[in-house]
Amino acid sequence: KGKNFKWKLLQNSPNTINAILSEKKLIKKWVSEYDLSGIISDNRLGVYSKKVPSVFITHQIRVMSGKTTWISSKIHQKLIKKYTECWVPDVEGFPNLSGKLGHVKKFNGNLKYIGVLSRLEKEIVPELYDLMVIISGPEPQRTLLEEKLIIELNDFSKPVLFVRGVIESEQIITRSDNIVFYNFMTSEELQKAFNYSNKILCRSGYTTVMDLAKLEKKAFFIPTPGQFEQEYLAKMYHEVNIVPTASQDDFVISDLKQIDSFRGLPKFKNEINWKQLFALFKGK
């Protein structure tokens, strides 16, 4: 599975290079056309300019790719150094959320750790669901996990909210015994759903991890097979007794009992000095 993922990355590399070149061409035009004061790139490697301060946002200073991690990381770091600053959505010290992904010993780039970022807010509301299942990621793995979990949940009697992660023209809500199914949710609905739920069963993508930390929710992770970043994060949290995990093939519903014996994600007080951060663009 890991080999298949790397092969797909290799196949997509011409598309990635073309995308970077297209972004650079567009940015060059925009800088002069709109008199830009600066650029903030959310993980887009072609979105920068030498003429104005340019910031790259990423939690991956080290890019996990199995045996080729060292070279994928070096390439990524070289591209990051083209930017004036790199903002990492994590804390610099320990404990942190990104582990080796966002923390490297030797890097000459201008890194700034800006704290854990999430658009969601913790709410004090009644608990409506014992378990929230939220599925995401590429096909066919999304469908394979959905089908597996529906079977496993036959042995789960408590209230469940199941978000399938399928974006369609209309929202569809169905009910089956103790489970409420949504094909997708808006950001506002997701915030309420997370807050209404006792525990979360989901992938271990970094955005989801930050959301769970912000909401102080306990979880169980099933990383997307072959996605090295998710597999690394899930393994790291499991080994330090923060969040339990299982592979997609091995997971059984009784594994959820482990959640209570794990500490849960650390709490962070985010005190981002936005004025200080954006001073980079002042007078440009």
What residues fall within each predicted segment?
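Conserved nucleotide-sugar phosphate-binding/catalytic loop shared by glycosyltransferases and other
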Residues: 1-15, 180
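Leloir-type glycosyltransferase catalytic cores
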Residues: 11-16, 242-284
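Conserved nucleotide-sugar donor-interacting segment of glycosyltransferase catalytic cores
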Residues: 23-87
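Short acidic active-site motifs
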Residues: 26, 75, 188-192, 208, ...
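A nucleotide-sugar donor-handling region in carbohydrate enzymes
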Residues: 58, 63-140, 164-168
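Donor-nucleotide binding loops and adjacent catalytic segments primarily
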Residues: 101, 115-199, 209, 231, ...
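Hydrophobic acceptor-binding patch used for acceptor engagement in glycosyltransferases
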Residues: 199-200, 218
